[in-house]
Every structure is written in structure tokens, then in C-alpha cells.
Amino acid sequence: NIIFNSASSRINAVLDWELSTLGHPFADLGYFLYAHYIPTGERHGLMGYNLEELNIPSVNELVSQYCKVRKVKVFDPTYYVVLSLFRNIAILEGVYARYINGNESSPNAKDIGKDVEPFAKATYKIIKKL
């Protein structure tokens, strides 16, 4: 959602500010990791795939690499994954609500409502383990 200047690396325009926030950097990591907790066949889900066979790093590998690069102590990202999933549930519900009200901004808004339940179930499953 950014337009770059073709002659340089300067940003000419930012097109989407609604989710633009300055927050804890671990929240970005939680967002990056959430697909590992969503079952395959669901929206962007990786859970159930053989990640090693697909050459996709595990959660532990990603967290270790992230912490190494950021020079921070390795930590459990569960809180941030749950936060990200909860945030996505709210976004998906909002898109679906706009569809129901006839104000959708996406041609697949009707289908997005189907994604709420798998996200909610994945989130609940993680929370139960805490």
C-alpha cells in the first residue's frame, strides 16, 4: 500500500493508513507468526503442512532468528500471536459487517465472514494452553 518513486527509494504516497500504528515490535512478530497457528485449508494457514519439506521455518526458528537480529533475549511469542489473531478476527468481522450492511469494499467480503470461526478457534486453542 505504498507507492515508491521509480527513480529512487523514496516513498511518494502511503495509500492505507487505517492499520498504521506504532506499537510494540513484538506485535509485528506475532502477526508474522500467526499463520503457523491456523489450520491448512483456512485463510493462510500453515498448521498441518510439513514446514521442513516446504523449507518454511518453524515458529521457534523464526523467533530465534528475530531475537538474534534484534539482539534481544529469546521469548515466548504466544501473547503477541494471540493479540494478532484477535486483531485479525476484529478486522474480518468488520469487513463481513460491511458486506451485510451493503457497504463492502471488497468483492470477496461475503467469504471473509467464513474466516472468523477458524481464527477464533485457533485463538481459543492457544489461550487454553496458557
Task: Explain the meaning of each model-derived region.
Residues T21, L51-L54, N108-D111:
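Pocket-edge positions in alpha/beta enzyme catalytic cores
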Residues I11-V14, S58-K73, P118, T123:
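Short amphipathic alpha-helical segments and their helix-coil junctions
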Residues G41-G45, F75-D76, N108:
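Short, hydrophobic secondary-structure boundary micro-motifs
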Residues G94, R98-L130:
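Regulatory N- and C-terminal appendages and interdomain linkers associated
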Residues N1-A27, Y31-L33:
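Active-site acidic catalytic loop and adjacent metal/ATP-binding pocket
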Residues I3-N12, K71-V74, A109, K128-L130:
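Conserved NTP-binding catalytic cores of kinases and kinase-like/nucleotidyltransferase enzymes
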Residues F26-R70, S84-G102:
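Active-site activation/catalytic loop segments of kinase-like enzymes and analogous catalytic loops
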Residues V72-S84:
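All-alpha amphipathic helical-bundle segments outside canonical DNA-binding/catalytic cores
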